[in-house]
Design a protein with these regions (language model features):
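Non-catalytic interaction-recognition regions
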Residues: 1-201
Length: 201
C-alpha cells in the first residue's frame, strides 16, 4: 500500500506475569493499564531509594523501555516470564541497566570535553575487549535481520554495557595525564555511546 512493504509479523509465545498465567475464569486477568501502572510505581520506588527525581514524561519513557527490553530479551520461541523486580532493576539484564550505563557514559563525556588527538593508544585489556565487541555491531544487526530474533541485539548490548562497567571500574579518564591516552578513551566512550544509542533506537 502506498509503495511501502508490508510489515513482517513475528509471533511470540505466552507472556507470564511473575510465572502466573492469566485466566478470566480464575479472575487473574491483568489489564494493560494496571500492568503499566505497576511498572511505573516500581520505578518510582527505585528512584526514591536513590533520592533521585524524574519527570513524568521521562518516567513514561522508562516504563515503555523496561517492558520492551524485557519482552525482546527473550527468544521468540520461549515463554516470556515478566518479573517486575528484574525488569525495573538498575542491575542485571534489564533495560534500566543499559540506560543507566548510557547515562553514565554521557556524564563522563560531558565532564571531559577536550580536543581529541589523531593518535590512538590503549594500555588496558578491557579497552581492547570493548573495541573488539563494538566492531561486531554490524554483524549483530545482520544476524538480527536474518533470524528475526531481537534477543540477539538485547544480549549484545547487555554485553557492551557489562564491558563498559568493567572499563569504568578499571580505567580513569578525568585524572589521566597522558593526553593521547585520555583522548583515546574518550573516543572509545563516544563509540560505545553511539552503538548503544543506535541499538536502542
Amino acid at each position: 500500500i502506498l509503495g511501502y512493504k508490508a510489515p513482517k509479523l513475528i509471533s511470540y509465545s505466552y507472556v507470564l506475569l511473575d510465572g502466573d498465567k492469566m485466566s478470566t475464569s480464575a479472575g487473574t486477568v491483568v489489564l494493560v493499564t494496571d500492568f503499566m501502572k505497576a511498572v511505573k510505581n516500581t520505578l518510582i520506588n527505585e528512584f526514591n531509594k536513590r533520592n533521585s527525581e524524574i519527570s513524568v514524561d521521562k518516567l513514561n519513557i522508562l516504563v515503555n523501555a523496561c517492558i520492551k527490553f524485557t519482552m525482546l530479551n527473550v527468544s521468540k520461541n520461549k515463554i516470556v516470564n515478566f518479573n517486575l523486580e528484574n525488569a525495573t532493576s538498575f542491575v542485571g539484564e534489564s533495560g534500566m541497566y543499559i540506560l543507566y550505563s548510557l547515562v553514565r557514559i554521557n556524564s563522563i563525556l560531558k565532564n571531559n570535553n577536550i580536543e581529541l588527538t589523531e593518535e590512538i593508544k590503549f594500555n588496558n585489556e578491557i579497552e581492547n575487549k570493548l573495541v573488539k565487541e563494538l566492531s561486531l555491531f554490524p554483524e549483530v544487526i545482520d544476524e538480527l535481520l536474518t533470524s528475526n530474533e531481537p534477543a540477539h541485539l538485547t544480549k549484545y548490548i547487555f554485553g557492551i554495557a557489562g564491558l563498559f562497567s568493567k572499563f569504568y571500574e578499571q580505567v580513569n579518564i578525568s585524572n589521566e595525564v597522558d593526553v593521547v591516552l585520555k583522548s583515546s578513551r574518550i573516543r572509545l566512550l563516544k563509540s560505545t555511546a553511539k552503538v548503544l544509542t543506535n541499538a536502542l533506537s
